[in-house]
């Protein structure tokens, strides 16, 4: 038995050793600093970063003025056929459209109305996506040869992804039918969703109604 186990281990199926091949030697490299305020601070004399190298910064962690984790995720969700740059251009153009529309409304409003108009498109986009978060999802469960659509609760990260996916699909369908460009539809949907309106909010409500109608199948979750 021990001989068979030794032969099995020699074939590299079992290994208790850590990977020693790493492009960033932990003795030489340190994590990069992505916070702009931290970058502006001078290093202490005894700071080890004066003598060591820094790892290459990830593309989604670069300290730029428009960096936002929710917007970055929306860009990834809207990417089609690997064209991430096109997706980024569409999403940022949608945010620019939101900014222009809100500023136009702000210039026409009186002093009292101006206080309630949000001009930051990132705040509007985050609020709109947050309002579209579904609380439940439908998942197929097979029992006795029959597949039932069973409602399941979902965690916050998945709810955010499903909200973005619903909004993306609605915008793509409307853009394909020639209503207008994707960026214009996305801007309209984000603005409407921030007010709990729009097609994505309607799709979320319909999903909740279906989950409520299928609650009799909830015992199939186990």
From Swiss-Prot:
Name of the protein described by the UniProt record: Small ribosomal subunit protein uS7m
Main location: mitochondrion
Organism: Caenorhabditis briggsae
Gene3D superfamilies, per database record: Ribosomal protein S7 domain
UniProt keyword Transmembrane helix, yes or no: no
GO CC annotations on file: mitochondrial small ribosomal subunit; ribosome
Assembly and interaction partners: Component of the mitochondrial ribosome small subunit (28S) which comprises a 12S rRNA and about 30 distinct proteins.
This protein's UniProt keywords: Mitochondrion, Ribonucleoprotein, Ribosomal protein, Transit peptide
Compartment(s) of residence: Mitochondrion
Transit peptide: 1-14
Signal as UniProt keyword: no
Domain of life of the native organism: Eukaryota
GO terms (BP aspect): mitochondrial translation; ribosomal small subunit assembly; translation
Gene Ontology MF terms in the entry: mRNA binding; rRNA binding; structural constituent of ribosome
Family listed: Belongs to the universal ribosomal protein uS7 family.
InterPro entries: Ribosomal_uS7, Ribosomal_uS7_dom, Ribosomal_uS7_dom_sf
């Amino acid at each position: 038995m021990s001989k068979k186990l030794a032969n099995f281990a020699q074939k590299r199926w079992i290994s208790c050793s850590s990977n020693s091949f790493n492009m960033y030697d932990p003795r030489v490299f340190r994590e990069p600093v992505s916070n702009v305020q931290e970058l502006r601070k001078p290093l202490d004399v005894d700071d080890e970063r004066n003598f060591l190298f820094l790892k290459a910064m990830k593309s989604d962690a670069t300290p730029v003025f428009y960096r936002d984790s929710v917007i970055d995720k929306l860009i990834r969700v809207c990417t089609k056929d690997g064209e991430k740059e096109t997706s980024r251009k569409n999403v940022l153009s949608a945010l620019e459209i939101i900014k222009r529309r809100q500023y136009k409304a702000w210039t026409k409003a009186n002093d009292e109305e101006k206080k309630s108009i949000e001009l930051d498109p990132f705040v509007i986009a985050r609020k709109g996506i947050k309002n579209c978060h579904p609380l439940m999802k439908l998942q197929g469960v097979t029992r006795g040869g029959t597949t039932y659509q069973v409602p399941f609760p979902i965690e916050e990260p998945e709810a955010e992804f499903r909200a973005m996916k619903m909004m993306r699909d609605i915008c793509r369908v409307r853009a394909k039918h020639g209503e207008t460009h994707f960026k214009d539809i996305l801007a309209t949907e984000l603005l409407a969703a921030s007010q709990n309106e729009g097609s994505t909010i309607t799709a979320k409500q319909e999903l909740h109604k279906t989950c409520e109608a299928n609650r009799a199948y909830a015992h199939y979750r186990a």
